[in-house]
């Protein structure tokens, strides 16, 4: 079985997409608390619609704040070092 590697350049995002600060805050807070997770579990834990979560994850990937990694046959979303800084900043603002 040949597995295609996902490339951030291939991921599409609407040009007029503006991320919700509330959604970003929920995603970041959940990732700080739970570490790397697959998108389905992350959407459940952050209490966000899956499609909405995916749009925000693509935006975060394009900004270099998260990256997708294959772990245990699952694609998990992981915070980068810049993402950890952003997460602590946005979590402090939302509280």
State what each model feature region is:
Residues 61-71:
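A short, conserved structural fragment
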Residues 2-27:
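Short alpha-helical segments that sit at the start of domains
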């Amino acid at each position: 079985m040949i597995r295609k590697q996902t490339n951030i350049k291939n991921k599409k995002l609407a040009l007029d997409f503006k991320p919700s600060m509330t959604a970003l805050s929920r995603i970041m807070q959940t990732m700080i608390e739970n570490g790397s997770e697959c998108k389905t579990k992350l959407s459940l834990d952050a209490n966000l619609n899956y499609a909405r979560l995916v749009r925000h994850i693509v935006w975060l990937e394009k900004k270099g704040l998260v990256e997708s990694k294959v772990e245990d046959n699952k694609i998990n979303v992981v915070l980068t070092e810049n993402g950890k800084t952003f997460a602590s900043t946005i979590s402090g603002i939302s509280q």
